[in-house]
């Protein structure tokens, strides 16, 4: 097993995750099996209970792990399915160590950060790296991204563990990539001083960098690379320019041009086979159409809906269609806003805020035949809207958000659950598809697997009444409703699951493909 450690300096939010994912893609393009581990130095066990407006999207893995959005990027770039073990948090590590101490595993030792915490971190990294995620076989290379910034107190135990692993591994089995900011001064010149200080801080911890990735608004010139090489004692071919790209999926190609893959192959003594051009063909496909999709959201931060944005782009690229997203505040959205869109998407969420705005948006799309895709909460509210305005239950609601007639109720297994973290219906669940439906047309099979994250479901007592009134439940898990659709509508489709989490640039999600195609047809009618 070979390891590539990715650290960050100067400031957070530089794109370490995209850099790590892009490195993985470069090596995958050369025929290697690549996995990835994300270290998040916070005390939370996982991302499941975090405020999305602060933390961003909670990405759901196939085994139900609620993790940082960077793991979504890993899955999309590398075309793999990761497990909960691939996200290591301070909370997880401390809980493991404390559990061992309580069991007496340490045989009376004084439990300390070094060696007990650092040993546990190394065990977690190795265990995740050796997961057999490739048809029963482990990966050839593991990329380990250390969250946070060099110098943060929270990251210190993890950086010490990286230092130890670097010493324990053979030279050809490890490489360290440091992502750092290259700011411009008032004259537009790129400044190297912050990077020099960041490299110095790493060296003071006993960690020596092999490659520097300079994040900047414009490419690094040869003079800047030569200066960094001299001052940071790194060969000039190890100074990689990473200017801001218009499309994140083009970052691997930009790093390829900079020689990143060749340098890593040299460091890790890997064969330098030619790169598979499939990725290039997919991400450079030209657009011949353009559509606007409105997302009726309650959170102002776009990162909350990252996987939805990417799934729309995957479908759009497959159909040579550029997707422009219009963000519509669920508490302020007006009918005119919706009518200006070629289609409307109602995403998942929690709580009562913005609920009525979303329901009103669903009604307008149903009545005015605007393509609509509802996800999770969007599925539940589609049922509520139908119950109110077609079935005639004026006070229909979800028991999560109202005191009326609850056509959406809590899952039986969720009753009495006290802890919020890790207790929802999470991860992969099978869904049976009904023949002759939109769902079957999209998936072309009778049973599918999709990822879930919810506590509420359609009340079984109302299913037959809803179906008699024209709502088709085309996907089920036993007596649990999973997909709802309407006949004689351009595209009215809602899922209890989250299809966006399984979408890839190489294989777009079927519901998103169908939705974008319907939006494209809807736009064509108005032209």
UniProtKB/Swiss-Prot annotation:
Any GO molecular function: metal ion binding
Protein residues bound to UTP: 12, 191-196, 227
A Pfam family this chain is assigned to: CTP_synth_N
Other facts noted in the record for this chain: CTPSs have evolved a hybrid strategy for distinguishing between UTP and CTP. The overlapping regions of the product feedback inhibitory and substrate sites recognize a common feature in both compounds, the triphosphate moiety. To differentiate isosteric substrate and product pyrimidine rings, an additional pocket far from the expected kinase/ligase catalytic site, specifically recognizes the cytosine and ribose portions of the product inhibitor.
Domain Glutamine amidotransferase type-1: 292-525
Binding site for L-glutamine: 349, 377-380, 400, 455
Organism of provenance: Methanospirillum hungatei JF-1 (strain ATCC 27890 / DSM 864 / NBRC 100397 / JF-1)
SUPFAM superfamilies membership: Class I glutamine amidotransferase-like, P-loop containing nucleoside triphosphate hydrolases
Summary of activators and inhibitors of this protein: Allosterically activated by GTP, when glutamine is the substrate; GTP has no effect on the reaction when ammonia is the substrate. The allosteric effector GTP functions by stabilizing the protein conformation that binds the tetrahedral intermediate(s) formed during glutamine hydrolysis. Inhibited by the product CTP, via allosteric rather than competitive inhibition.
Region spans: Amidoligase domain: 1-270
Family classification: Belongs to the CTP synthase family.
Role this protein plays: Catalyzes the ATP-dependent amination of UTP to CTP with either L-glutamine or ammonia as the source of nitrogen. Regulates intracellular CTP levels through interactions with the four ribonucleotide triphosphates.
Binding site for Mg(2+): 70, 145
Residues binding ATP, per UniProt: 13-18, 70
Disulphide bridges, residue numbers: none
Name the UniProt record assigns to this protein: CTP synthase
PROSITE patterns: GATASE_TYPE_1
Active site residues according to the UniProt entry: 376, 498, 500
Keywords from the UniProt entry: ATP-binding, Glutamine amidotransferase, Ligase, Magnesium, Metal-binding, Nucleotide-binding, Pyrimidine biosynthesis
Catalytic activity from the UniProt record: UTP + L-glutamine + ATP + H2O = CTP + L-glutamate + ADP + phosphate + 2 H(+); L-glutamine + H2O = L-glutamate + NH4(+); UTP + NH4(+) + ATP = CTP + ADP + phosphate + 2 H(+)
CDD domains: CTPS_N, GATase1_CTP_Synthase
Catalytic activity, EC: 6.3.4.2
GO biological process, one term: 'de novo' CTP biosynthetic process
Subunit structure: Homotetramer.
Chain positions recorded as CTP binding sites: 12, 152-154, 191-196, 227
């Amino acid at each position: 097993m070979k390891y590539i450690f990715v650290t960050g300096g100067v400031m957070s939010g530089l794109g370490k995750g995209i850099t790590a994912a892009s490195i993985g893609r470069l090596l995958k393009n050369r025929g290697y099996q690549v996995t990835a581990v994300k270290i998040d130095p916070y005390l939370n066990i996982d991302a499941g209970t975090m405020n999305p407006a602060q933390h961003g999207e909670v990405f759901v893995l196939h085994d139900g792990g609620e993790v940082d959005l960077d793991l979504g990027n890993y899955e999309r770039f590398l075309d793999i399915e990761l497990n909960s073990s691939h996200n290591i948090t301070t909370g997880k590590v401390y809980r493991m160590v404390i559990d061992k101490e309580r069991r007496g595993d340490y045989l009376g030792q004084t439990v300390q950060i070094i060696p007990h915490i650092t040993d546990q971190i190394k065990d977690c990294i190795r265990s995740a790296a050796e997961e057999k995620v490739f048809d029963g076989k482990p990966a050839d290379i593991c990329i380990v991204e250390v969250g946070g910034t060099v110098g943060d107190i929270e990251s210190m135990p993890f950086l010490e563990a990286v230092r130890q692993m670097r010493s324990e591994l053979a030279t050809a089995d490890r490489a360290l990539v440091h992502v750092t900011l290259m700011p411009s001064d008032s004259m537009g010149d790129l400044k190297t001083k912050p990077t020099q200080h960041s490299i110095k801080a790493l060296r003071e911890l006993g960690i020596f960098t092999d490659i520097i990735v300079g994040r900047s608004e414009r490419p690094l010139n040869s003079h800047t690379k030569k200066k960094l090489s001299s001052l940071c004692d790194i060969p000039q071919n190890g100074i990689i320019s990473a200017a801001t790209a218009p499309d994140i999926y083009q970052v691997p190609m930009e790093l390829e041009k900079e020689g990143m893959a060749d340098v890593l192959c040299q460091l890790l003594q890997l064969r330098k086979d030619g790169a598979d051009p499939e990725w290039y063909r997919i991400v450079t496909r030209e657009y011949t159409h353009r559509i606007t999709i409105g997302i009726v959201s309650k959170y102002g931060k776009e990162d909350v809906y990252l996987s939805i944005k990417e799934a729309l782009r995957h479908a759009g690229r497959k159909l040579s269609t550029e997707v422009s997203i219009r963000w519509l505040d669920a508490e302020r959205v007006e009918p005119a806003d919706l009518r200006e869109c070629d289609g409307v998407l109602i995403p998942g969420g929690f709580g009562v805020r913005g609920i009525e705005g979303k329901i009103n948006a669903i009604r307008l799309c149903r009545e005015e035949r605007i393509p609509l895709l509802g996800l999770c909460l969007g599925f539940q509210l589609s049922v509520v809207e139908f119950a109110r305005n077609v079935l005639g239950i004026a006070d229909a609601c979800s028991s999560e958000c109202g005191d009326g007639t609850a056509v959406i109720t809590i899952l039986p297994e969720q009753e009495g659950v006290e802890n919020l973290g890790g207790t929802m219906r999470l991860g992969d669940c099978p869904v049976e598809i009904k023949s002759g439906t939109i769902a079957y047309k999209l998936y072309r099979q009778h049973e599918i697997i999709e990822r879930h994250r919810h506590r509420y479901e359609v009340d079984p007592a109302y299913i037959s009444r809803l179906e008699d009134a024209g709502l088709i439940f085309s996907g089920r898990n036993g007596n649990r409703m999973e997909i709802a659709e309407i006949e004689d509508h351009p595209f009215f489709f809602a899922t209890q699951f989250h299809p966006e989490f399984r979408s890839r640039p190489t294989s777009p999600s079927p519901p998103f493909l169908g939705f974008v195609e319907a939006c494209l047809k809807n736009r064509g009618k108005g032209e």
